[in-house]
Regions:
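N-terminal basic, Ser/Thr-rich segments that initiate or prime the first beta/alpha elements at protein or domain
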Residues: 1-456
Length: 456
């Protein structure tokens, strides 16, 4: 059994954690403009950096990994004492391979192993060479006769939103420049192309609020650009025992999940998804909850969905029972919304130039409050065709979830008020200590879940 070394990028974690140690004193001296002290701090930081590099070198040469013929992975540590951690391929729930752009330049890959039932703190993350990472994944979770699919829903949705955001952000930047530099200038030709609504906004929007909106739109555009780059060359595959996906342009990502270890599948409905009529589907296996969806399907084209996850059942399109329901749904967004609204109303008479600026957080929390109202009417539990299904609201996202794993722990908690009106909070705990909480549901609905767990 041959032992292999980790990639040198494995030391980046140590360097990143110690970065603050020699940057904070340097910044303090720099602001004081004491150049003699600055040179002394630079010398100290250089010595500290060399010590950290030496420590990283020791860590790299004291650690190694090996893989035997039976598919058992072992991570070794040999410095002062010997420590080995062993993971069998049969005990894995999922495996991910990440190759950020700077990793690709150095030929490195970040591999994360998710053992069955282990929490996220017990996952194993390695930095390996690209060929070693691919070989390790093929040995632990081999792909045999996969069926490939290349859904275009996510790529088109991200591209459409990115285009709309780019146009709106450009208009906001032009408005901000116009508010900052009043009078005819070289931007007049550009503003001639802005429609009546943009001109109206330019008249009433202060410069500070315009720049704030433009910066917010720019950050949203970066997020959408990242989403689009991640969905390029995206493909989904499945075998008799596994399901997975891979893709990306600058940053590459691959996920392999055992089908029998999927805890639940989650269809997330957001305002953008409703607008584009494309629904992202996420899966969770053990403590593995990938940031990217497994696939995105379009309304009316559910064939791929049924092929990849035939056991999935969508929660029924029903309104939840709201009689005697707790108003805790509205607290997280309602309190800051009321505060911002009060400040906006006060500024209208005391400081009118801040009114429009204060409207921005007011509208933001107002949108969250609208999401809370949707959760108040839609969140609930249902048994459908032998599957536990639930719907829960988080911010602007409505999660439609189907439980697929038999090992689920149900916990019902009641306050005295909830007990008096027959309501309870139900928490579902899955392998890997992943928890889902459904708030203020009827006690009789929760009891149906308990009886279902006892008989199945």
């Amino acid at each position: 059994m041959t032992e292999h070394r980790l990639h040198p990028f494995a030391a980046l974690r140590v360097l990143r954690k110690t970065l603050v140690l020699y940057l904070v004193p340097l910044l303090r001296v720099l602001f004081e403009r004491n150049w003699a002290a600055l040179r002394a701090a630079l010398r100290q930081d250089l010595i500290l950096f060399l010590l950290v590099c030496a420590l990283s070198w020791v860590i790299l040469h004291a650690s190694s990994w090996s893989l035997d013929e039976s598919g058992t992975f072992c991570l070794h540590w040999k410095l002062l004492f010997r420590f080995d951690r062993t993971v069998r391929g049969a005990s894995l729930a999922a495996l991910t391979i990440e190759r950020p752009f700077y990793y690709r330049l150095a030929g490195a890959s970040r591999v994360t192993l998710y053992p069955v039932g282990e929490p996220k703190q017990r996952t194993l993350t390695l930095c390996l060479r690209r060929a070693d990472a691919q070989h390790l994944a093929d040995q632990l979770l081999p792909i045999e006769a996969p069926s490939l699919h290349r859904p275009k829903g996510g790529e088109r949705a991200a591209l459409g939103l990115l285009g709309a955001n780019s146009l709106s952000t450009l208009a906001l930047f032009l408005l901000a420049i116009r508010q900052t530099q009043q009078g005819p200038d070289r931007y007049e030709l550009a503003f001639a192309q802005i429609n009546f609504l943009a001109g109206l906004a330019a008249r009433w929007l202060p410069a500070g609020a315009a720049w704030l909106l433009a910066f917010s739109g720019f950050l949203l555009g970066l997020s959408l650009l990242r989403s689009f780059v991640q969905t390029v060359h995206y493909e989904v595959w499945h075998t008799s025992t596994q399901i997975g996906s891979r893709g990306g342009w600058l940053d590459r990502f691959e996920c392999r999940v055992k089908s029998d270890q999927i805890s639940f599948a989650d269809v997330r409905l957001s305002p953008f998804a409703r607008l584009m009529r494309r629904w992202p589907v996420f899966v969770t296996a053990g403590s593995c909850s990938p940031e990217l969806p497994l696939f995105v399907y379009r309304s009316g084209e559910e064939a791929l969905f049924r092929e990849l996850l035939p056991e999935f059942r969508m929660p029924p399109d029903l309104l939840a029972r709201t009689e005697q329901r707790s108003l805790i749904f509205f607290a997280p967004a309602g309190i800051p919304f009321a505060l911002c609204l009060l400040l906006t109303l006060v500024s209208a008479t005391v400081l009118p130039q801040l009114t429009v600026t204060l409207l921005i957080p007011t509208l933001f929390f107002g949108a969250l409050l609208a999401g809370a109202a949707a959760g108040y009417r839609r969140e609930g539990l249902w048994l459908r065709e032998g599957r536990m299904t639930l719907r829960r609201q988080q911010g602007l996202y409505l999660h439609c979830i189907c439980v697929l794993h038999p090992d689920v722990c149900l916990t019902a908690t009641q306050s005295p008020w909830a007990a008096s009106v027959g309501r309870t909070n139900l928490t579902l705990t899955f392998p890997g200590w992943v928890k889902l909480k459904v708030r203020s549901v009827p006690l009789r609905d929760a009891e149906k879940f308990f009886k279902f767990m006892e008989t199945n």
